[in-house]
Structures are given as structure tokens and as C-alpha cells.
Amino acid sequence: MLASGLLLVTLLACLTVMVLMSVWRQRKSRGKLPPGPTPLPFIGNYLQLNTEQMYNSLMKISERYGPVFTIHLGPRRVVVLCGHDAVKEALVDQAEEFSGRGEQATFDWLFKGYGVAFSNGERAKQLRRFSIATLRGFGVGKRGIEERIQEEAGFLIDALRGTHGANIDPTFFLSRTVSNVISSIVFGDRFDYEDKEFLSLLRMMLGSFQFTATSTGQLYEMFSSVMKHLPGPQQQAFKELQGLEDFIAKKVEHNQRTLDPNSPRDFIDSFLIRMQEEEKNPNTEFYLKNLVMTTLNLFFAGTETVSTTLRYGFLLLMKHPEVEAKVHEEIDRVIGKNRQPKFEDRAKMPYTEAVIHEIQRFGDMLPMGLAHRVNKDTKFRDFFLPKGTEVFPMLGSVLRDPRFFSNPRDFNPQHFLDKKGQFKKSDAFVPFSIGKRYCFGEGLARMELFLFFTTIMQNFRFKSPQSPKDIDVSPKHVGFATIPRNYTMSFLPR
């Protein structure tokens, strides 16, 4: 009995020493790191965080420690930036220092630093430069891609008319349409809406994207080194990501067999041609792994964010029928009902433009942004960030900065209108991030949002099975991503 008591006392003493040593080490190594709650060994600040509402947890901590603070997600140390000023100072004013890519544990399981989105250094620069130039070559930002979006919008209108006003979940109607635009660029063709493989891909994308926003997804961000070996929802997310990689790899193999170097059909062909041109360059970043992962980056990003924004937007308009009515009025007055909307119409449609911006602001698809990393020892404000320090630029805190938006928690298109009813830009509108790692698909996404949104609203009015006052527009999950609640609606022809 005495021996077991002594053993217990010894264990408790050892644990106490470990905790004290950990705190001392953290403080010593931190130097002038931003302040933050004291972490415990291995679990970090887990006990102070609500993994169901990670964004809100971090914002609550900022109330105590200020707009720049340090948090420990398990053993992972992260500096968090809140509000317009802190985010802009880091990502724009000190753009080079903050241009590294941090960890996103779920996606890192697959990408492992390859591809344009999650790479660093010279690899990121080369792949980004190539991707921007190649997308432009295939019409992004030009009339060519606008015609492709208009064509796809026509297919969507036909599909929605085919529902005959029945109550439907719009999720896959929207994701099929949006995905087909990026598919035509990276794969050279669109998918049929009933293609089973296509629908399976969309489910995989949606499943893995939604996992990152769940409580388990946030836990995985903290304890990935352990959880990747355990059963749980993360294993299903890995399975979905692997399925997406396998699909892309199969597409690449087909293009390799049928490649004509003088006539590239799509993004994959263009990358394969660049691989041939650089095959004698020992430092090339143009090889199969980067091709597969970059293509998957484009396919994923080009589908989920725009389709989820539209899905959130329709829910908000059913909650606010007076906004829907004003958009209908502006569409009828500027475009009419006898021609398709064009991107140039937006210059004459300030209210619709304000509504789309407010949907993006309120929807806040990536509230914590993609993690950044400082690529050298960096002085930021009065703090010192050692090389490799991870940084969360809280984009949601910029989109809700009360200095820029009078009622940031409310959906209100007036946030983007001046006193004369004209559209007004805002420096705090950052859904595509800012700085050197801004989303280079921003131009394509803006065009898609405007053309799909106006074409759908030109042809339909929305009806919810619930009355407006009963519609819940709070998100289902807010983690890495913001996911709107599942809902059904009717598209009633106008």
C-alpha cells in the first residue's frame, strides 16, 4: 500500500515538474511572441477552446489578449491576427515575410506540400505563376470564359425548370453547375449532370470540405499526429480525398496517352507540355505529383466556395424577401427577360452587386483563412515571430469589423451602398484573402457569382417551406470553413 502511495506521489511530482518545465520553455522560446493563454503539455490550449465554434473561441480570446495573440492548438503554436488593421499589416504591408503557407492538417494528409495551394517557396511561386498564366490562356477573365459560364447557366435553368416547383435540396444542382466551369478548363470538357462518377466526385468534395468545419475536424487540426492512426470521421475524409486524387490521376494518364504538344486541350495538357520542356532541369517543379495536386487544388477550390456561397445566398434571400424583390426589380429593369445576363451588366446594377457582396461577407466561407507561415524571423508590431511561425489571418474578423460595417452581424446590403444607392467598395471585403497568397481564382469566382446569381433570379423566385421568420440563417458549422444549414426550397418560374 505504502509503495503504491509513493509511486502515485512520484508520478504527480514528475507531472508537475513537466508542466512547469513546459511553461518555462514556452516562455523562454517565445521571447517577444504575442501574449496568449498558457498552454499545457501536448494539449496546448485545448481546454480553452470550443471545437464546435473554433472561430468564436479564438475571437473571445482576442477580447482578453488583443488583436494579435498566440494560441496552442495541441502542440502546434499559432499566432492569430484579428481585425482589418492586423491582417492588412501582415498580409499586405509585410507581404513577403507572411507569404509562407501554414498547415491545414486534413488537406496536408493528401497534398503533403505539393500543388499550388499548400506549397511553399520556389515551388509555390512557379506553380502559381504557371497556373495564373494558363488559366488566362484558357479564357479566364475574358469573353471566352463568360460564354462558358452563360452556357452552363442555361443548363442549370433547364434542370431547375425540370423540378416543376417541387421542394428540392439545391446543393448538387449548384455544385454540378459551378464545377463544370472549372472542369471545362482543367479537363477540357463538362460533365453530364447525371454522370454517376461526377456526382460521386462532388459528394467526396463536399464531404471532405464539411469535415474541416466540424468539431472532429478542428480536433484533427490539433492532434493530427495521433488521430490519423485512429478510427473516426477523419478516415472517411481521407478516403474521399484519396478518391479525388485517384480520379485526377486517371485523367492525367488519359491526357498523357493522347497528348498533342502543339495543341493543348486543357490545363492538364499545358502542364504536361511544360513537363516535357523542363525534363532536363534538375530543379524543375513541373512533374506528375505537382500536376495531380495542382489540378485537384483548382478543381476543389473552383467548385466548393462558389457553390456554397450561392447556397447560403438563396437561404438569406428567403429570409429577406424584400431583398429578393429589389433584386428582381433591378434585373427586370436593366436586363429584362429576353436575354441572358452579361458580366458588364453589373456596372448598372448596384443593388444586385451589393447583395452578392453582402452574401459573401455574411457567408464568410473561410473565416480563419488558409494558414500562413512567416518564412524568416519577422518583427511584427512590438513582437518577434521566429521563422516558421504559423499565422491565422482571421478573415471573418475583417468581414465583421464594426469600423467598416455598421451592423456586422446582420445581413444588410446597405453595407455596400452609398447614400445615393450606388455600389461602394470596402477595404474590409476580403473573402478571397489579400497579399501574395490571395486567391488567384477571384476574377473567375466573381464572374460566376454574378452570372449564375442573376440568371437564376431572372428566371425564378424562391419559396421556402418555412415562413421567413422561422428560417435559421446561422451556420451549421464554423471551423476552417463556414457551412450553411441543409435546407430545401422551390424554384418557381417567374
UniProtKB/Swiss-Prot annotation:
Keywords: Endoplasmic reticulum, Heme, Iron, Membrane, Metal-binding, Microsome, Monooxygenase, Oxidoreductase
InterPro entries from the UniProt entry: Cyt_P450, Cyt_P450_CS, Cyt_P450_E_grp-I, Cyt_P450_E_grp-I_CYP2A-like, Cyt_P450_sf, Cytochrome_P450_fam2
Substrates-to-products reaction catalysed: an organic molecule + reduced [NADPH--hemoprotein reductase] + O2 = an alcohol + oxidized [NADPH--hemoprotein reductase] + H2O + H(+)
Molecular-function GO terms, alphabetical: arachidonate epoxygenase activity; coumarin 7-hydroxylase activity; heme binding; iron ion binding; monooxygenase activity; oxidoreductase activity, acting on paired donors, with incorporation or reduction of molecular oxygen, reduced flavin or flavoprotein as one donor, and incorporation of one atom of oxygen
Annotated effect of mutating F453Y: In allele CYP2A13*5
Record-listed heme binding positions: C439
Cellular compartments per GO CC: cytoplasm; endoplasmic reticulum membrane; intracellular membrane-bounded organelle
Coiled coil regions, renumbered to chain: none
The keyword Endoplasmic reticulum appears for this protein: yes
Stated consequence of mutating F300I: Decreases phenacetin O-deethylation activity 40 fold
Amino acids binding substrate: N297
Annotated EC: 1.14.14.1
Outcome when changing R101Q: In allele CYP2A13*4
Gene Ontology terms describing biological process: aflatoxin metabolic process; coumarin metabolic process; epoxygenase P450 pathway; xenobiotic metabolic process
Distribution of this protein across tissues and organs: Expressed in liver and a number of extrahepatic tissues, including nasal mucosa, lung, trachea, brain, mammary gland, prostate, testis, and uterus, but not in heart, kidney, bone marrow, colon, small intestine, spleen, stomach, thymus, or skeletal muscle.
Main enzyme class: oxidoreductase
Xref: PANTHER family: CYTOCHROME P450 2A13, CYTOCHROME P450 508A4-RELATED
Function: Exhibits a coumarin 7-hydroxylase activity. Active in the metabolic activation of hexamethylphosphoramide, N,N-dimethylaniline, 2'-methoxyacetophenone, N-nitrosomethylphenylamine, and the tobacco-specific carcinogen, 4-(methylnitrosamino)-1-(3-pyridyl)-1-butanone. Possesses phenacetin O-deethylation activity.
Protein name (record): Cytochrome P450 2A13
Organism: Homo sapiens
